[in-house]
Amino acid sequence: MKEERPIIALDFSSFEETKAFLDLFPAEEKLYVKIGMELYYAQGPDIVRYIKSLGHNVFLDLKLHDIPNTVRAAMAVLKELDIDMATVHAAGGVEMLKAAREGLGQGPTLIAVTQLTSTSEDQMRGDQNIQTSLLESVLHYSKGAAKAQLDGVVCSAQEVEAIKAVTPTGFNCLTPGIRPKGSNIGDQKRVMTPNQARRIGSDYIVVGRPITQAKDPVATYQAIKAEWAG
């Protein structure tokens, strides 16, 4: 599948900032937004309930990584928030991924984080003591996620084609680190433009600061959406 809307990363910590940003958009514009650790830990489940009450889709990106029983129970709780997508960390192993699927059920999309887009190959080898290539690590995690019946993975757009080649048809690739041409890449090491991500086969893209910190967030969002749609 291909989600037509870019997912907006709500890189805020307060309810007021979040509401002010969402209020910029007309009520009929239904967004797909990402709630990460900063916003969720600051505001808790109520921020999810508020955004869902506006009719937006919610991707809750908490990257759960714990023993299978704990992850299963946590996902069952998150399911009650009517989220549309959630993440777990692939490094937790296939049994943990299966437990996450059991807890969340078959409704929401469940994807696994492979290697963060802020991670370079040298960092992976030095910090994680993984001595394969970065791509081989990502493919290993992706195959584990597919085995556990997850819906896809978070990955760099540069890895999408290789992941699609080793996973079942319909396995989704969500790519963060998307930056419009000419924008600051921030702390991302592996980035692409929306157009490049579309052409290479990404199913979802996540864009944060280029939209949330833009002088005109609505116009910037619409431009990125148009570029993503092709």
UniProtKB/Swiss-Prot annotation:
The active site is at 63 (proton donor). GO terms for cellular component: cytosol. Pathway: Pyrimidine metabolism; UMP biosynthesis via de novo pathway; UMP from orotate: step 2/2. One of its GO terms (biological process) is 'de novo' UMP biosynthetic process. GO terms for molecular function: orotidine-5'-phosphate decarboxylase activity. It catalyses: orotidine 5'-phosphate + H(+) = UMP + CO2. Keywords: Decarboxylase, Lyase, Pyrimidine biosynthesis. Gene3D superfamilies: Aldolase class I. Its EC number is 4.1.1.23. Substrate binds at residues 11, 34, 61-70, 117, 179, 188, 208-209. InterPro entries: Aldolase_TIM (IPR013785), OMPdecase (IPR014732), OMPdecase_AS (IPR018089), OMPdecase_bac (IPR047596), OMPdeCOase_dom (IPR001754), RibuloseP-bd_barrel (IPR011060). SUPFAM superfamilies: Ribulose-phoshate binding barrel. NCBIfam families: PRK00230.1, pyrF. Homodimer. Catalyzes the decarboxylation of orotidine 5'-monophosphate (OMP) to uridine 5'-monophosphate (UMP). Belongs to the OMP decarboxylase family. Type 1 subfamily. HAMAP family: OMPdecase_type1_B. This is Orotidine 5'-phosphate decarboxylase.
